[in-house]
């Protein structure tokens, strides 16, 4: 859902914790729990050659986000007790790579600012289409009245639905990427996640009520000035919404799951909502007849799981619980079965499109029997 190609289209970004030589480190969570982990680093694939280039190092990398208009990358780092934002000059970095003289990160990174602790505990972020603001999710303390209201309104799942993430008072803040100044956008009374900014219209933000499973209202929309804050696609009790993606200028694509028998009593599949009119359109569903007799809880077959769309609204793509990747012509409804048996582990296929809409990119554990992921790409330029 975030930009993966550099602005000039010459490099593709991915993350990995297994390609480098980083040693396992231990950190302490806010609740005092100890956690061991191997640091994740950012890598780029040069599209013309297939060469893989490591772009970050060290144990303190947070999130990275490619700029929309120039070859830059915004990088957050946890340094001591501070959450710091930097911007990396990728043109300078790639030029040095070609000359075989890569410097330290400090040679390419410029400090932007430190997130103020009084504004909350920062998490994920997205960058506005003009590259001038980062919209950052936060957890916050709030008031006792807010906490009481949050618990009263918290989602109560069916017996076979997980709630892996407990409700938390949260919000969205914005950082000026020129000055480092941080200001409030909105406060929420649910765990706020999966934040995305429009790549086309400044100040439009989509985010979710993150439970790790179903929610009574998953998708939300707000503007960067905080004047608009509303549900996006008002759900019914049988809607299990997931994997929203701010794919195009006027449409947010998402999935309504159909993998449980009770969820099949109404339409499911890849859906899109028009941000200007709130009109909703079902794009398509597949594989619901597969494994109908499977043991309840088996995630095999049973329709789409994740989705994305090309920027011109011509194509939608989705992966299924069975590990297949499908392509749908949004205008005609014609479906193409692109890929089989991605294993959906150690992570899901998560198909997405190149900026020009001619290629579908996805992850696959097929060639490692689900032990490691390969990045795969299918050229769809000949598809009608």
Predicted segments, located by residue:
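Conserved beta-propeller blade repeats
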Residues: 2-15, 58-77, 113-134, 139, ...
